[in-house]
Regions:
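A structural signal for short secondary-structure junctions
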Residues: 42-43, 95-98, 124
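PLP-dependent enzyme catalytic core of the Aspartate aminotransferase-like
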Residues: 82-86, 108-153
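Short, well-ordered loop/turn and helix-capping segments at boundaries between secondary-structure elements
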Residues: 16-17, 54-58, 86, 149, ...
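Structural signature of PLP-dependent enzymes
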Residues: 27-46, 51-81
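Active-site PLP attachment segment
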Residues: 1-25
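Conserved PLP-binding catalytic core of the aspartate aminotransferase-like
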Residues: 61-119
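Active-site-proximal structural scaffolding
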Residues: 4-8, 42, 73, 109
């Protein structure tokens, strides 16, 4: 996903097993599952990744962009937690700042999620997973205030 190739079916699977025999059995089962989905996996995404990683200039550009995005998301996490704390939410949401990646779970229940969606137009899934990358200066205060409102109900 770091390459933004969501529809290209790129990826890797790592298998850890107790011994070589178990690894062979698991590999056979994984291959059978892959064949059931498609007999010839697409190569376009993998070819793009290979091109980027094998070219020093492209790899440097990709790494720079990835670092910028990671720093942006980490900054958003910190800003969101600071905003939550500044409005006086009693619960500890500092875990959001310590997490990694584009998504975070708010740890609210399904009724609170539905209140965020229906009453505040804050969109997240029932598990309370939000896309941190979707937070910005224009909506961070609204998001924190909406969260505070549903937590008080």
């Amino acid at each position: 996903k770091n390459f933004g190739l969501y529809r290209e079916r790129t990826g890797a699977m790592t298998l850890i097993s107790e011994n070589e025999a178990a690894a062979k059995v698991a590999t056979t089962q994984i291959a059978a599952a892959a064949r059931a989905m498609y007999s010839m996996p697409p190569d376009h995404g993998a070819a793009i990744v290979q091109l980027i990683l094998s070219n020093d200039a492209l790899r440097t550009e990709w790494d720079t962009e990835l670092t910028e995005m990671r720093d942006r998301i980490n900054g958003l996490r910190a800003q969101f937690v600071k905003q939550i704390q500044s409005i006086g939410i009693d619960q500890d949401f500092s875990f959001i700042e310590r997490e990694k990646g584009m998504f975070s779970f708010l740890g609210v229940d399904v009724d609170q999620v539905q209140a965020l969606v229906n009453d505040h137009s804050v969109y997240l899934v029932n598990s309370s997973r939000i896309n941190v990358a979707g937070i910005n200066d224009a909506n961070i205060e609204y998001l924190a205030n909406s969260l505070a409102t549903v937590l008080k109900v």
